[in-house]
């Protein structure tokens, strides 16, 4: 009898019993009337008359009127008092439950070390990301982003070489730039060391040259001198200050991203917690690209 603990089930059971009783009552009344009553009353003027059978000018039965009135009253109660419009949705309930779970999840795992974060991120990657990016995260021969290189200098070099479909920024798609590998590496070194919050590069000797190229090759035209991609307080291009960080990854997970093959959908519906996004970012950063 656990189902009686839910007031909706109780309400439905009572309503079903009421309907059953009324049905039995009305059915018995009609059967009795059909058996005992005689034709009487006035026929409607200009009413239907078929084979000598006419249509009486009777009033609407009391039972019908009562049914109509009860239905109207019930509908009014249902929409304005019982379950007001927009007061509840299954999606909203799901989101609230996930939010509560994420709070417990983060409280439980808030003191994870670096290795544990990477392990957690690997688990998230294998469940949600490996189908497109591959078990090795190398992008399945170009069908998806190579995450071994993404978020690092190698990822910037790939973007310079091949361009980027982007994330529906006002600047549109970024075209490929005609730069040799050395110049691309210099720009990547400058971005990772001076613009990105990562503040780290494997080639510190190329930072100054990278800055010159970043300004002279037109990168500032879209990304701005500070790399934030803002123009007139609008997001015009990718924010390079967040490149390689969990904030950049969170933006992609929230909005999705165009690719050369297909389109990465938004993962906003997954309701990843901040800790899960951080763990996934740590895992991606732990992947070591091969030297070109």
Curated annotation (Swiss-Prot):
Entry note: cofactor: Binds 2 heme C groups per subunit.
Alphabetical keyword list: Cell inner membrane, Cell membrane, Electron transport, Heme, Hydrogen ion transport, Ion transport, Iron, Membrane, Metal-binding, Oxidoreductase, Repeat, Respiratory chain, Transmembrane, Transmembrane helix, Transport
Pathway participation: Energy metabolism; oxidative phosphorylation
Transmembrane segments: 11-31, 62-82
Lipid bilayer topology: Multi-pass membrane protein
Cofactor: heme c
GO CC annotation: plasma membrane
Full protein name: Cbb3-type cytochrome c oxidase subunit CcoP
Natural source organism: Helicobacter pylori (strain 52)
Lineage, opening ranks: Bacteria, Pseudomonadati, Campylobacterota, Epsilonproteobacteria, Campylobacterales
């Amino acid at each position: 009898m656990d189902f009686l603990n839910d007031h909706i089930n109780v309400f439905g059971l009572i309503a079903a019993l009421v309907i059953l009783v009324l049905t039995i009552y009305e059915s018995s009344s009609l059967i009795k009337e059909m058996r005992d009553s005689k034709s009487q009353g006035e026929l409607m003027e200009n009413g239907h008359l078929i084979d000598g059978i006419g249509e009486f000018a009777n009033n609407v039965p009391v039972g019908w009127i009562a049914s109509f009135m009860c239905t109207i009253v019930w509908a009014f109660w249902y929409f304005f008092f019982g379950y007001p419009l927009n007061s509840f949705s299954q999606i909203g309930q799901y989101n609230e439950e996930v939010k509560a779970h994420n709070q417990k999840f983060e409280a439980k795992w808030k003191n994870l070390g670096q290795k544990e974060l990477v392990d957690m991120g690997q688990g998230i990657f294998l469940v949600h990301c490996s189908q497109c990016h591959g078990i090795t995260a190398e992008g399945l021969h170009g069908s998806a982003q190579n995450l071994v290189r993404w978020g690092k200098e190698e990822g910037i070099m790939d973007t310079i070489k091949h361009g980027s479909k982007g994330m529906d920024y006002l600047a549109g798609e970024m075209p490929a730039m005609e730069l040799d590998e050395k110049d691309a590496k210099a720009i990547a070194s400058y971005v990772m060391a001076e613009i990105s919050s990562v503040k780290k590069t494997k080639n510190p000797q190329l930072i100054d040259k990278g800055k010159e190229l970043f300004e002279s090759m037109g990168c500032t035209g879209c990304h701005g001198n500070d790399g934030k991609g803002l123009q007139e307080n609008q997001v015009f291009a990718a924010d390079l200050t967040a490149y390689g960080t969990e904030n950049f990854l969170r933006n992609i997970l929230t909005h999705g991203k165009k690719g050369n093959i297909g389109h990465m959908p938004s993962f906003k519906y997954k309701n990843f917690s901040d800790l899960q996004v951080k763990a996934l970012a740590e895992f991606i950063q732990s992947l070591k690209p091969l030297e070109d």
